[in-house]
Structures are given as structure tokens and as C-alpha cells.
């Protein structure tokens, strides 16, 4: 049997309100592309990117979930099997930041107890329109014992760093004996309906 082209498979989720830039972050990382004309994501889509970390080839399966309230019943099932979750807010949108607490509760309710979480304050290139200080982002992350980055999908600021940090944190929690298991337990579950359309930047 031919060897798989990767050693481990990690399922990651991008969670947050609509319009915070989840899809732009995803496409910046997966394709090094940025498009300001993305329409709002309908349902759920995912991208694949394989990275090298600590001498291992890790296949990242990154799911882009719609943030609108009406889609919560759809996204809930996608928490299952997630090993890492990025909670994204827009530094120019106070409501999207306030809702991070709600998303954290949602994760606590539906995701695995040992899932690795990270908070991203996106659109840090728009400092003239900032309404959420970096300190507030750092504090909510610190309060929940999770890591934090400010990112810009537009200017490609800290996007790669965030994904690599999340993958490294997941890898650090996994003993070597789980390598084979990780290949098989987080294979893609096809959603009933997918869209390749994007979200906002």
C-alpha cells in the first residue's frame, strides 16, 4: 500500500460573525490570494493545505463556517472532530468582538473538550477605523487561556503565523502513538451543500 502524502490530518474551523473576514483569511492562507468582491458564504466550505511542522507533513483541512445566526444549526454539527478553532472578529466592528464570548460558549457546548482555540482580531490594516483595542483582544484571550493574534488578510499580516501556531499547539497535545489514529478520525465529512463563494475581508 502506497504511503500517504501526509503524516497527520488536522480539522480546523474558522468561526465568527458574518463579514469579519473568515473567508479572506482562509484564501490568503490556502491560496495566497485576496479578493474584496467575495460574497457572503452560504453554508460551509473547506480548503486543504499541507504544511511541514516538526519534521511531519500535516494536512490541514480548514472549514469556513457561515457566521449568521440562522446558520448556527448547520455549523453545530461541524464542531464534531475539530481539533483547532479560530474565533475571528473585526477590529472595526465592536459587535463582532462582543460576540466572541457567545462563540466561545457555543464551542464549549458543542466542540471537543480538548480542542485548541485561538482568537484573531482581523483587519488590523484598518487602524484608522479601529474600535476594538489590541489590549481588549489580548485580555479576552488571556481570560480564557487561549492564544491571540491580530491579522490582516488584505496585507497578509500574521495569517500564516496564526495557522502554524495553531497547528503546532495541536501537535504538541498529541502523543506520537496517535499518528495513525489522526489520519483516520478526521477525514472529511461531506456537507449536504457546499459553496465555493467567499465571505468578507
Swiss-Prot record:
It catalyses: GTP + H2O = GDP + phosphate + H(+). GO terms for cellular component: axon; cholinergic synapse; dense core granule; early endosome; early endosome membrane; endosome; Golgi apparatus; Golgi medial cisterna. It holds the Pfam family Ras. Disruption phenotype: Intestinal cells exhibit abnormally abundant rab-5 and rab-7 positive enlarged early endosomes, which accumulate basolaterally recycling transmembrane cargo molecules and fluid indicating a block in basolateral transport. On the other hand, rme-1 positive recycling endosomes are missing. No endocytic trafficking defects in oocytes or coelomocytes. Almost complete loss of cnt-1 endosomal localization in the intestinal epithelium. Overaccumulation of endosomal phosphatidylinositol-4,5-bisphosphate. Nearly complete loss of basolateral endosomal tubule extensions of the intestine. GO terms for biological process: endocytic recycling; exocytosis; negative regulation of 1-phosphatidyl-1D-myo-inositol 4,5-bisphosphate biosynthetic process; positive regulation of establishment of protein localization; presynaptic dense core vesicle exocytosis; protein transport; receptor recycling. Changing residue 68 to L: Constitutively active mutant unable to hydrolyze GTP. Associates correctly with membranes. Displays more extensive network of basolateral endosomal tubules of the intestine. GO terms for molecular function: ankyrin repeat binding; G protein activity; GTP binding; GTPase activating protein binding; myosin V binding. Rab activation is generally mediated by a guanine exchange factor (GEF), while inactivation through hydrolysis of bound GTP is catalyzed by a GTPase activating protein (GAP). Tbc-4 is a likely GAP of this rab. Denn-4 is a putative GEF of this rab. The keyword Repeat does not apply. A lipid is attached at residues 200-201 (S-geranylgeranyl cysteine). GTP binds at residues 16-23, 64-68, 122-125, 152-154. Almost ubiquitously expressed. Expressed in intestine, hypodermis, seam cells, body-wall muscles, many neurons, oviduct sheath cell, spermatheca, coelomocytes and pharyngeal and nerve ring. Its main location: membrane. It is found in: Early endosome membrane; Late endosome membrane; Golgi apparatus membrane; Endosome membrane. The keyword Cytoplasm does not apply. PROSITE patterns: RAB (PS51419). Keywords: Endosome, Golgi apparatus, GTP-binding, Hydrolase, Lipoprotein, Membrane, Nucleotide-binding, Prenylation, Protein transport, Transport. SUPFAM superfamilies: P-loop containing nucleoside triphosphate hydrolases. Residues 175-201 are annotated as: Disordered. It is a lipid-anchor. Disulfide bonds: none annotated. Its EC number is 3.6.5.2. Residues 184-201 have a biased composition (Polar residues). Belongs to the small GTPase superfamily. Rab family. This is Ras-related protein Rab-10. It comes from Caenorhabditis elegans.
Amino acid at each position: 500500500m502506497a504511503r500517504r502524502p501526509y503524516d497527520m490530518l488536522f480539522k480546523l474551523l474558522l468561526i465568527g460573525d458574518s463579514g469579519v473576514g473568515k473567508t479572506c483569511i482562509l484564501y490568503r492562507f490556502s491560496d495566497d490570494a485576496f479578493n474584496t468582491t467575495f460574497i457572503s458564504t452560504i453554508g460551509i466550505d473547506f480548503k486543504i493545505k499541507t504544511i511541514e511542522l516538526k519534521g511531519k507533513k500535516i494536512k490541514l483541512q480548514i472549514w469556513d463556517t457561515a457566521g449568521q445566526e440562522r446558520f448556527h444549526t448547520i455549523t453545530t454539527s461541524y464542531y464534531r472532530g475539530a481539533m483547532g478553532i479560530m474565533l475571528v472578529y473585526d477590529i472595526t466592528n465592536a459587535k463582532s468582538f462582543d460576540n466572541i464570548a457567545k462563540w466561545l460558549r457555543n464551542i464549549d457546548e458543542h466542540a471537543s473538550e480538548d480542542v485548541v482555540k485561538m482568537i484573531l482580531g482581523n483587519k488590523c490594516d484598518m487602524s484608522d477605523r479601529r474600535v476594538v483595542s489590541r489590549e481588549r483582544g489580548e485580555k479576552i484571550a488571556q481570560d480564557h487561556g487561549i492564544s491571540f493574534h491580530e491579522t490582516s488578510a488584505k496585507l497578509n499580516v500574521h495569517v500564516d503565523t496564526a495557522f502554524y501556531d495553531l497547528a503546532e499547539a495541536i501537535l504538541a497535545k498529541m502523543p506520537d502513538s496517535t499518528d495513525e489514529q489522526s489520519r483516520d478520525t478526521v477525514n472529511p465529512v461531506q456537507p449536504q451543500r457546499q459553496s465555493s463563494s467567499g465571505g468578507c475581508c
